From Swiss-Prot:
GO terms for molecular function: structural constituent of ribosome; zinc ion binding. A zinc finger (C4-type) spans 22-44. It comes from Pyrobaculum neutrophilum (strain DSM 2338 / JCM 9278 / NBRC 100436 / V24Sta). InterPro entries: Ribosomal_eS27, Ribosomal_eS27_Zn-bd_dom_sf, Ribosomal_zn-bd. This is Small ribosomal subunit protein eS27. Keywords: Metal-binding, Ribonucleoprotein, Ribosomal protein, Zinc, Zinc-finger. It holds the Pfam family Ribosomal_S27e.
Length: 67
């Protein structure tokens, strides 16, 4: 590979871990952005994320995207 191309590009994953706050009780918990199962709040049991075949549909508020 010629020197003018520089570094080899490595694809980064589009999925992330995210911290979500429950709108009912205020509990914060970490979930996966592409969750394949229903994610419920550990305190009150409300559904925070529903799978859609791609990215999960979030019902809570995203606080932080973890790297």
């Amino acid at each position: 590979m010629p020197a003018r191309f520089g570094k080899t590009l490595i694809p980064q994953p589009r999925s992330r871990f995210i911290k979500v706050r429950c709108p009912d009780c205020g509990n914060e918990q970490v979930t996966f952005s592409h969750a394949a199962m229903v994610v419920r709040c550990l305190v009150c049991g409300r559904v925070l994320a529903q799978p859609t075949g791609g990215k999960a549909r979030l019902a809570g508020h995203v606080i932080k995207v973890l790297e």
